[in-house]
Amino acid sequence: NDQLRFNRAELLEWATARNLDVSPDLFAREESSHALLPTVSQALADGGIVYGVPGGDRAAVLHAVVSVMKLPAEVDHDELCQVLLARECLGSTGIGDGIAIPHVRNPLVLHVTQPTITLCFLASPIDFHALDGKPVNTLFTLISPTVKTHLHLLSWLSYALRNPAFKEAIKRQAPRDELMLRLAAAEAAVDR
């Protein structure tokens, strides 16, 4: 048939990893309603912000991250760690500037009902094999119930990370309240 087809999730991950400026609306389908999809602020409020997460390598850090995540009781923590590590083997989720966005390749694997983003600041930076070669000290771990929600949150998070005030607050590991205010301002700066 000589047609090229691209997976939306893989395309967004590729663009995010290369720090390309991608509008969140690019991945929205016309029939979708943004009113029904959560904001990054909502997902982060549900997932939480954790400081001083230990670990000397990707595996140890991901185990520590999963242990502090607010997950439903039926989610197997060891299985989630394995899925996140398998995703890292396909290609690092380290997007540069000390930030990684670990997430499962297929959101439906976990069977969760509520999307969450857990922001973890590491006790010490680690090599996450990021494209820019810099060690990672900040992880936004994304868990979604559907591919649509996954793409929505991943694209909006990638967009928010381009906001200078939000990014600066992340770099200095600002207090929770300030981070949430900066994120809300970054989201509000874009016409939804």
Question: Could you tell me what each predicted segment is?
Answer:
Residues 1-192:
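Cytosolic covalent-transfer regions centered on His/Cys nucleophiles
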